[in-house]
């Protein structure tokens, strides 16, 4: 027997106390009071670890309850056969149809799948970009000892009416040479690639700040002007703007390639 199992060895050799079961029952009954006391009185690191442990226990408990309820829903009720001669009670008349709870659960799952499919993109995951790679520190001031300015090293979109702030107030600089106005957009169903103007940056997966700055990186969702494609809605109206996802690295290729989200 391993050396660390000396307690098990002692129990096998001498048995347990005569009041072991009673002491165990009382200890389990007091457990709730002990947990309540610790939750109210613990402070510092021990309180953090206690809260973390309790959170994990509650999550596991809720998961187990949800699985149990799901198994109840999935169980089909026994159908009533009117030929048996037993009259069905009034409160069970609406249960002759299939289980409504199961049908409702299935419809909700189907809607979730449709929603996920609707918003699915060609590139669901992209590589993270650090701030050191995104921004370059610019030295300013008479002695070049101030370093509060940053220059974006990636391609950006700034829009038509963009005006730079005064030099003394501009903290983040977007170079003119790295600004993009158009993108090579590919229609996945038609199989054509068109040079379309960019209307705006919808979402950059790296950070909300990069979305606000209009940074164009791989996986960014942009809005493009698709009026040249002649797309129309079911009501006969011309589609003006549509979303597309960037599939290349604009700072490496020097251009923006995107796939239209249809």
From Swiss-Prot:
Q: Name one GO biological process term.
A: maturation of 5.8S rRNA
Name where it's found: Nucleus, Nucleolus
Keyword annotations from UniProtKB, A to Z:
Nucleus, Ribonucleoprotein, Ribosome biogenesis, rRNA processing
This entry carries the following GO cellular component terms, namely:
nucleolus; preribosome, large subunit precursor
Superkingdom, according to UniProt?
Eukaryota
Show the segment(s) annotated as Disordered.
Answer: 1-39, 61-86
Q: How does it assemble?
A: Component of the pre-66S ribosomal particle. Interacts with NOP7 and RRP1. Interacts with RSA4 (via WD repeats).
Its biological purpose is as follows:
Involved in the biogenesis of the 60S ribosomal subunit. May play a part in the quality control of pre-60S particles.
Family recorded in the similarity comment: Belongs to the eukaryotic ribosomal protein eS8 family. Ribosome biogenesis protein NSA2 subfamily.
Protein name as it appears in the record: Ribosome biogenesis protein NSA2
């Amino acid at each position: 027997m391993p050396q660390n199992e000396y307690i098990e060895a002692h129990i096998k050799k001498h048995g347990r106390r005569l009041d072991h079961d009673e002491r165990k029952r009382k200890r389990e009954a007091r457990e709730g009071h002990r947990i309540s006391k610790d939750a109210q009185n613990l402070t510092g690191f021990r309180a953090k670890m206690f809260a973390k442990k309790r959170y994990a226990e509650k999550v596991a408990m809720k998961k187990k309850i949800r699985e149990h309820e799901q198994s109840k829903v999935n169980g089909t009720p026994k159908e009533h056969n009117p030929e048996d001669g037993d009259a069905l009670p009034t409160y069970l008349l609406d249960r002759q149809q299939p289980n409504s709870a199961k049908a409702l659960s299935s419809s909700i799952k189907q809607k979730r799948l449709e929603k996920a499919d609707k918003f699915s993109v060609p590139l669901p995951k992209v590589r993270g970009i650090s701030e050191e790679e995104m921004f370059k520190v610019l030295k300013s001031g008479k002695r070049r000892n101030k370093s509060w300015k940053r220059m974006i090293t990636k391609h950006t979109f700034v829009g038509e009416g963009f005006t730079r702030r005064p030099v003394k107030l501009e903290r983040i600089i977007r170079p003119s040479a790295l600004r993009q106005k158009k993108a090579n957009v590919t229609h996945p169903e038609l199989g054509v690639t068109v040079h379309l103007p960019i209307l705006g940056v919808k979402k950059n997966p790296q950070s909300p700040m990069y979305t606000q700055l209009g940074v164009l990186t791989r996986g960014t969702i942009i809005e493009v002007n698709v009026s040249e494609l002649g797309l129309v809605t079911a009501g006969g109206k011309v589609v003006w703007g549509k979303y597309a996802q960037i599939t290349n690295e604009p700072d490496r290729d020097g251009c923006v390639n995107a796939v239209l989200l249809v």
